[in-house]
């Protein structure tokens, strides 16, 4: 029996979005869901207890970073990631592919894998499908990702075609190398850029290998939102309806709603903690850059419609003061609020699917948040 199972509960009559349950070895979680990112086995500044209190079900950790520090052997010795970081809900690990392609100045792609430089000290490293499986098997995540090539955006059709073919061959090698198929579910990653025929080829190749779940990769890499939505429109229908669908690296509120409408079940992004560290927060009325002088004497919560720990206890003026003074507590408060905001947004999305009104919810949310204004900012 596969360790990862998807159960479809309902399809929204208004939009076609899916309400479902993702069953994992560490619990069952409603989808569509947002997964906070804990790159180095921690969601920056937040404790596992706080994440639970917010309602997080699955969190993400990063294969590449944990391989370098502290080393997958140490995590394995600790009893796996769950035990190492004291998290008893779901964990998804990415394959390390994206980091190899985004962090390393120097890299050489060969059929057997990728040679690249360690971004910390410049040492030469080699990552292959087999190595990515070995690391993730040691980490013991509930969901592992296949090692794929992450092409740059934009890329030529010829480059993308070769890349898709290589990713399919690597996916097959990942399945063969996966040592714990009864404990950890391995997802395939559909690539192909913005080319419909290549997405189709990639999806067909991977579906024929019968993974327990599928990710759509190569989006949110700099392409316009319209391109991402168009690619999702022709890609998600190619994936099996009885398996979970995961859109990698996407976390802005508009893209979460638009992704769900296009049949996506799982999302992850560093966005809430990254912008939180810069003093930017998402609220029901749009984006607030808390460092701005106009908040110096604003003694109201970050978001008057939010009941998170931050909004129940602290004011914009106080949080602005902390952020301006580089106080860690300020970053904790903005990060807590932002992660909570996206987890609650997905609860609202699920409720709207239940009531067949996700299209109406989208209109209302976009209007309130300010996405409908000309020159609206991304998040």
UniProtKB/Swiss-Prot annotation:
EC number: 2.4.2.29
Active site (record annotation): 94 (proton acceptor), 268 (nucleophile)
Pathway(s) per entry: tRNA modification; tRNA-queuosine biosynthesis
Catalyses which reaction(s): 7-aminomethyl-7-carbaguanine + guanosine(34) in tRNA = 7-aminomethyl-7-carbaguanosine(34) in tRNA + guanine
Keywords: Glycosyltransferase, Metal-binding, Queuosine biosynthesis, Transferase, tRNA processing, Zinc
Zinc as UniProt keyword: yes
One cellular component term from this protein's GO annotations in UniProt: cytosol
Region called RNA binding, residue ranges: 249-255, 273-277
GO molecular function: metal ion binding; tRNA-guanosine(34) queuine transglycosylase activity
Superkingdom of the source species: Bacteria
Binding residue positions for substrate: 94-98, 148, 191, 218
One Pfam family matching this protein: TGT
Keyword set includes Glycosyltransferase: yes
Gene3D superfamilies: Queuine tRNA-ribosyltransferase-like
SUPFAM superfamilies from the UniProt entry: tRNA-guanine transglycosylase (SSF51713)
Chain sites annotated for binding Zn(2+): 306, 308, 311, 337
Cofactor: Zn(2+)
Co-factor remark: Binds 1 zinc ion per subunit.
Coiled coil: none
PANTHER family according to UniProt: QUEUINE TRNA-RIBOSYLTRANSFERASE (PTHR46499:SF1)
NCBIfam families: Q_tRNA_tgt, tgt_general
Subunit architecture: Homodimer. Within each dimer, one monomer is responsible for RNA recognition and catalysis, while the other monomer binds to the replacement base PreQ1.
Its job: Catalyzes the base-exchange of a guanine (G) residue with the queuine precursor 7-aminomethyl-7-deazaguanine (PreQ1) at position 34 (anticodon wobble position) in tRNAs with GU(N) anticodons (tRNA-Asp, -Asn, -His and -Tyr). Catalysis occurs through a double-displacement mechanism. The nucleophile active site attacks the C1' of nucleotide 34 to detach the guanine base from the RNA, forming a covalent enzyme-RNA intermediate. The proton acceptor active site deprotonates the incoming PreQ1, allowing a nucleophilic attack on the C1' of the ribose to form the product.
This protein's name: Queuine tRNA-ribosyltransferase
Organism encoding this protein: Anoxybacillus flavithermus (strain DSM 21510 / WK1)
